Every structure is written in C-alpha cells, then in structure tokens.
Amino acid sequence: MTRFRPCIDLHEGHVKQIVGGTLSDLGSGLITNFESDKPAEFYASLYRRDRLTGGHVICLGPGNDDAARRALAAYPGGLQIGGGINAGNAPDWLEAGASHVIVTSWLFSADGQFLPERLAALVEAVGRERLVIDLSCRRTPDGGWTVCMNRWQTFTNLPLTPATLSRLAGSCAEFLVHAADVEGKCRGMDETLLPFLADHSPIPVTYAGGARSLADLQLADNLTGGRVDVTVGSALDIFGGMGVPYADLVIWNHRDPSLSSV
C-alpha cells in the first residue's frame, strides 16, 4: 500500500516549506509557505517516536549541514539525506546517521549532461543499497518529463522514461521524484506521473508534489496499486498547513495493509 514518507526541508538552516519552482541561486522570487520556529531535530524526533520510516532530509542550498546533522543524530538510521551529495561526502553522511544518501545534481555536468561515471563512483563509495537517485522533474511541451537539477532550475539531458528508470534501477535502492511544477502548491498531485512511476519503476519509488489531503494518499494508492509512496509537506498541520493532520498520516501508515485499495 502507499505509505506516507515524512520530510524535513532545510533552507538557510531552518525548516521550511517552499514552492519548489521558485528556488534560485539569487533567492529572488522565492515563495516560502512556512518557516518553523522549531529545529530540524524536533521533527526527526517526532518521526522516530511515531515509527515513520523512509523519510528524508533535503538541504536546499548552502548553510544547512549543521541542522541536517542534528536531525540525523535524533533519528539514526531513520532518515535519508539529500542536497549537495557527492562521492566524497556521501560516506560521511552515512556515518552521521543517514540510512541512505540522495543524489541528483552531482550526476550531471554544469550544463546538465548525465555523467554515468559519477554514478559508478557513488555506488563504489556507498553501495547500491544505500543510494537513492532523485529524478525530480518538470513537464516538457510534449507531455513528458525531464529530470532537473540545481534546485530544479536546470533541465538536464535525461528524460524521465521507462528506459531511464530501468537503466538506473540497477545502481540504487530507491528513486525519489519531486514533481517540481506542483511542488509546494497544495493544488493536487501529478496524476499522470504517479501511475507512470508505478508501471515502470522496477524498485521502490517515493513521489512528492502537490499532495493536499488524506484523500490524495488514497488517490495515490488507487492510481499506483500501492506501489508508490507519497511525501506530504506544505499541506501538513505541523508545517503550517490546513489540509492534513499529521496524526492522521501516522494512523494511515500503521493501519492494516489489507485494508488498502489495490
């Protein structure tokens, strides 16, 4: 069944919820839905208490390492870490308590060309079983998707296709896919992308972007046959949202899987 995957998004050392498509190097045009007065480790401890697994900490730009390390220390082995990951620092993040490292931008050249030798270096450094590839994407005019990097600012040369998923699945444990065009907007999920991922990903995959209610988790479960997990961010009450009580998602995750619609 589709599970809720918790998140901790860090920007300038603070827990925030940001409209994904507004991130930029200059910071101009940034739309922030929520900035917490609580530290990252508060949320990590909450997820640990409620036995929520497979969540992630994402560092959006510089200045987040200390906050990320505190979160990982609060829930050792319970959270993945992404943002600025490369073959050099990935082992250190695992040592700091991350269950997996999540990588996107480092797999590409500055102009967005996929570099398979870097993926091989990461697999060598941490092992396939500790690696998550972030294939966060944006829509293209032809109705498909292209993987984006640099906080979703730069389109790469890697289309999100069945062949891409099949090709990369042998080098990682999971995929993480933010639908950047709807991320942080609480206006609904990409209902075409969800079943596409379910049909074509040979390994576990987590979708993020636009989930706004508990009904959206049920919708994802229906659309994917329970094969894709979902992250809920800006709609959560613990992140200032009004669409989804966190307590309801804890109950959802711990319910009898036989009750799931498949």
Regions of interest found by a model, annotated:
Residues 66-101, 192-230, 241, 246:
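Catalytic cores of alpha/beta
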Residues 115-120, 157-162, 187-195, 245-249:
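Charged helix-capping and loop-helix junction motifs
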Residues 11, 15-26, 94-182:
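Conserved anion-binding
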Residues 51-67, 105-113, 177-186:
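Glycine-rich, proline-tolerant flexible connector loops at the mouths of alpha/beta enzymes
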Residues 25, 36, 40-94:
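N-terminal active-site wall of soluble small-molecule enzyme domains
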